[in-house]
Amino acid sequence: MRPKLIAFGALIIGFITLSWGIVGHERINKAAVMALPHPLQTFFYNHIDFITQEASVPDIRKYALSYKDEGPRHYFDMENFGSADSYPKNLEEAKKKYDAKFLSDNGILPWYIEDMMVKLTKAFKEKNRAEILFLAADLGHYIGDAHMPLHTSANHDGQLSEQKGIHSLWESRLPELFAKNYKLNVPYAHHYEDVHKAIWDMINDTHSLAQPLLDIDKKLRTATPENQVFKMDAEGKVLKSKYNTAVFSDEYAKKLHEQLNGMVESQMKKAITATASFWYTAWVDAGKPDLSDLDSPEVTKRNAKALKEDWDLFQKGDLFGMRNQND
């Protein structure tokens, strides 16, 4: 029997076109549960449906509900913040140094992740099940965003280099087409001795891929006729999506995926490791509280067999029950 969702209704979520999409975010959060050491894995596995489905809720707040404070949490335009030694240490300092418009335009992603870690650690200390699950699932989304190179760049959609559309192509369309072939098994999570440093190391590593990503796409676009880069309508014009953006052809997506040489899969795996490790770090820093009494023993026992089966699948790089429109 598959694990049952405890005390939370299932979320029915439509496809989000930006920010890894459902395909990426759900896989990252679900695999991160499998990468947790025991006993933390047991607790998270009891709620794996919620952790998985809630992975895209920050995008729903951003796009469907238009929460005005949500957008800047998803990105950090590194080039516009000056030298690294001048970065504010936390969100409070950032708000003192920069005005609201600057932060809205350029993002607060790394500081928001650190702020979320403080809240998650507190929730673990208090053994507040609802807050643990909500914060952990949300945190997984932002860590996923922190592994998308263009979420760390001012040239976030190639708009500064005549490459518009590259953002959603890289993080949504490519996973849609190819994620079912990715092997997403990673080693167990580890504890970060310095959370602040771990966050900025993650951001810097991701940002180092932004220009190579753009260069690969630029070279390939230049060498490919327009009618092969984009899908064309009956009149021979570039087909536009409902968001009025050009629709890339599957053939171009395949070529770009090949040229990127595993970058998308690699970043997803890094995101899985980081998500599990930040969850684990918050739990350890909270004193490793015993969470076994937050769920009924009967539910944990019932889920034990499914956990073993899913663990065996995960060791092979597979995740149970993950589908998308191309499967």
Question: How should these model regions be labeled?
Answer:
Residues 1-5:
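Positively charged n-region of N-terminal signal peptides that target proteins for export
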Residues 18-138, 149, 154-273, 277-327:
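N-terminal, motif-rich segments that launch catalysis or mediate targeting to/interaction with membranes
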Residues 140-144:
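Functional cores that coordinate and move charged inorganic groups
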Residues 7-17:
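Bacterial N-terminal signal peptides
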